[in-house]
């Protein structure tokens, strides 16, 4: 459920180390002049530049400069793309989504695109912190990457769990806690848990666990990336308020939890 990038071998997938099922994450540290090729073209890929500078190159060798705070999206079936480190090296997080249907050659695919954190308007900015929907601005379709900052003592999204979406959180700065809230059925097997988290921690939340998650900053502000798949059939449950969100229907409703045998007659 939680892994720290300093405690995971460089060649190992950080997402898998944290318990991810269908998504991947690697931290790439490139020395000046190093190049890393695009991964599987059957999966949407999102890269976030943590430090340094370099260029994102297409199969024709045309390069676009990249720098810290850049979010780069490479769509399904794009091939031959690479990332090259400049004179200061390059540190990048590479998120890889689940394998998708390979589009027909006639499908209209946007080219790989880049959005910088400093150039994207925040969806929310206030006393609790700041929230930037980042990868969507760079053209992501099947997955998403958001940047968040929680001010000291403040919490993020309310406790929730997904039926189909898978999420990864990467703590970039500061520290805090992640709380795990079991659904009524899961509560028969476990109690609510709280885990300490800090910069470098990767938190995995696979789908259909029946266990909700909840982030809160500690005595200092906490900055993090939130990555997730975007499944149209996902159902999201909010245990604190007993709400259900059907994304594909655009509907949020409150339900009454019941036991399996509630209302049934004995034969």
Q: Which stretches of residues belong to each language-model region?
A:
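Short beta-strand His + acidic residue motifs that chelate non-heme Fe in jelly-roll/DSBH
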Residues: 37-38, 56-57, 74, 80-87, ...
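Glycine- and acidic-residue-biased ligand/ion/polar-headgroup-sensing regions
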Residues: 43-59, 164-166, 170-177, 181-184
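Short acidic-glycine-tyrosine-enriched beta hairpin
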Residues: 60-78, 182-207
């Amino acid at each position: 459920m939680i892994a720290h990038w300093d405690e995971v071998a460089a060649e190992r997938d950080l997402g898998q180390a944290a318990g991810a099922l269908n998504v991947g994450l690697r931290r790439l540290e490139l020395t000046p002049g190093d190049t890393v090729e695009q991964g599987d073209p059957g999966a949407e890929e999102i890269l976030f530049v943590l430090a340094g500078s370099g260029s994102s190159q297409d199969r024709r060798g045309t390069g676009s400069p990249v720098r810290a705070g850049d979010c780069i999206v490479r769509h399904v079936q794009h091939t031959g793309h690479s990332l090259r480190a400049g004179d200061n090296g390059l540190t990048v997080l590479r998120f890889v989504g689940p394998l998708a249907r390979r589009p027909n050659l006639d499908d209209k695919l946007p080219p790989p695109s880049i959005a910088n954190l400093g150039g994207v308007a925040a969806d929310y900015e206030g006393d609790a912190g700041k929230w930037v929907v980042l990868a969507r601005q760079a053209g992501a379709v099947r997955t998403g990457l958001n940047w968040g900052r929680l001010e000291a003592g403040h919490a993020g999204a309310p406790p929730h769990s997904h039926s189909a979406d898978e999420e990864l959180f990467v703590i970039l700065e500061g520290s805090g806690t992640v709380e795990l809230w079991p659904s009524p059925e899961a509560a028969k097997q476990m109690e609510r848990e709280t885990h300490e988290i800090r910069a470098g921690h990767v938190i995995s939340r696979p789908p259909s666990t029946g266990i909700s998650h909840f982030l809160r900053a500690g005595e200092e502000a906490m900055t993090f990336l939130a990555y997730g798949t975007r499944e149209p059939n996902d159902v999201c449950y909010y245990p604190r308020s007993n709400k259900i969100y059907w994304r594909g229907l655009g509907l949020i409703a409150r339900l009454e939890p019941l036991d399996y045998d509630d209302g049934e007659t004995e034969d």
